[in-house]
Amino acid sequence: MSQLVYFSSSSENTQRFIERLGLPAVRIPLNERERIQVDEPYILIVPSYGGGGTAGAVPRQVIRFLNDEHNRVLLRGVIASGNRNFGEAYGRAGDVIARKCGVPWLYRFELMGTQSDIENVRKGVTEFWQRQP
C-alpha cells in the first residue's frame, strides 16, 4: 500500500486522527522552513482553514509542499478535515486541492473524526489503493 501524507496544525486534531487510523503516514512539517519530499504515490490528509472562505482554506505548509512538482505529481487523492460550523465551507481545503490538482476528494471528517470516520477512511484507503494500477 502506498502512503498517507498529512498536515496537522498545533491543535493536533489531524495528528490524533492519523494516530487512531494506524496506517503508515508522513507529516508535512509545521515549521515552514522544513521541507519533505515523497517518493511514492500518496493520499493527502489536510485540515481546512480560513473560517469558511475559499481564500486561506489550504494551510501554507501544504501549499508549499504541493508547489514542489515532484510532490504534486505523486498525489492521488485528498481527504479533508474541517468544522461543520462553517457550513458549505466544511472541509473546503479538500475541494480546493482536488480541483487544482485534478485528483479525487475521497472523504471529509470533522475535527479529529469519529470512530466511524476512522473505519471509513481505513477501509476506503485500502480499497482505493487496490484499484490503482
Swiss-Prot record:
What Gene3D superfamilies does the annotation carry? 3.40.50.360
A biological-process GO annotation: protein modification process
**Pfam families named among the record's database cross-references:** Flavodoxin_NdrI
> Which InterPro entries does UniProt cross-reference here?
Flavoprotein-like_sf, RNR_Ib_NrdI_bac, RNR_NrdI
From the UniProt record, which GO molecular function terms apply?
FMN binding
Family matches, as HAMAP family: NrdI
Function noted in UniProt:
Probably involved in ribonucleotide reductase function.
Q: Which family does it belong to?
A: Belongs to the NrdI family.
Query: What is the protein name for this chain?
Result: Protein NrdI
Specify the species: Escherichia coli O17:K52:H18 (strain UMN026 / ExPEC)
Taxonomic path? Bacteria, Pseudomonadati, Pseudomonadota, Gammaproteobacteria, Enterobacterales
